[in-house]
Design a protein with these regions (language model features):
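Hydrophobic, Leu/Ile/Phe/Ala-enriched alpha-helical segments that form helix-helix packing faces
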Residues: 50, 96, 119, 123, ...
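SAM cofactor-binding core of SAM-dependent methyltransferases
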Residues: 55-145
Length: 263
């Protein structure tokens, strides 16, 4: 009988070196196999509304994966920045009909007053008024108010306690969907408000593909702005890598990015 020779050590070490180590966020950002994949009917209806209003939303794959991550992470305090008319919110409300996954507090932050009215109707439709809120304000203004509240609480806690902060914090899950123009500043403002195990989710901005040399006028200016914004995004990711785990999940239509403090 022929004897099987052991693999040469050099070959086996080469194989182990070629295998990519698992990223710390791989499990948290992965698909949730126990949840249905079909879009909830209310979310689908909102998607049709968006088409009629000529507005965009996160890709279906990204919305569904955010729902999956929310179910796995089970956050107590959730803040959605740039909630729009509730396309993603409807996915989350649908998940949180099951009290096993429901957070203690959920704040939908939206700058548009008319959108805020639509979000309030959505919240009431899911009978979520006891644990959900609609905050109509610019995100940077909300953050400034939270920081002011924290400063007041540190010096005069009895007085500060009489007025609740505008959003629940520290934030266990923060979802940022504000478009490429303001994405970097809004993500940077949200990071310090995360809890120790807090997770920030956002859709990676599209890589600019236009040929600046062939563009003129407004088209050239718009493409230059996109390039500058994407470069700012790359700089932010590099900076965060020193203190945070930054995970990327490429999917059809977009790439979900997860950011969580190391350790």
């Amino acid at each position: 009988m022929a004897r099987l020779e052991p693999e040469p050590p050099a070959a086996s070490s080469m194989e182990s070196e070629s295998e990519e180590p698992e990223h710390p966020l791989d499990g948290l950002l992965s698909k949730h196999d126990e949840l249905v994949r079909k879009e909830p009917q209310i979310a689908a209806n909102i998607g049709e509304q968006l088409k009629h209003m000529d507005l965009e939303s996160l890709p279906l794959t990204v919305r569904r994966r955010i729902r999956d991550v929310a179910a796995r992470h089970k956050p107590a305090n959730v803040v959605e920045v740039g909630a729009g008319i509730g396309h993603l919110s409807a996915w989350l409300f649908d998940l949180w009909q099951d009290e096993e996954f429901r957070p203690d507090r959920y704040a939908m932050v939206e700058a548009g007053g008319k959108f805020g009215i639509i979000l309030t109707r959505l919240m009431r439709r899911y009978e979520a008024s006891k644990w959900a809120d609609v905050v109509v304000a610019e995100w940077l203004d909300v953050v400034a108010n939270v920081n002011a509240w924290n400063a007041a609480f540190a010096t005069t806690p009895d007085i500060a306690a009489l007025e609740a902060p505008p959003i629940p914090h520290p934030i266990d899950l923060c979802i940022v969907d504000v478009g490429w123009k303001r994405q970097v500043e809004c993500v940077m403002a949200a990071i310090p408000l995360l809890s120790n195990n807090g997770l920030l989710l956002t859709n990676e901005p599209d890589v600019p593909t236009g040929d600046l040399a062939s563009l003129e006028g407004d088209e050239a200016s718009s493409e230059e702005a996109k390039v500058a914004a994407f470069n700012e995004w790359i700089t932010l990711v590099k900076m965060l890598n020193d203190t945070h785990n930054v995970g990327f999940v490429p999917m059809f239509g977009g790439t979900l990015v997860g950011i969580q403090r190391k350790g």
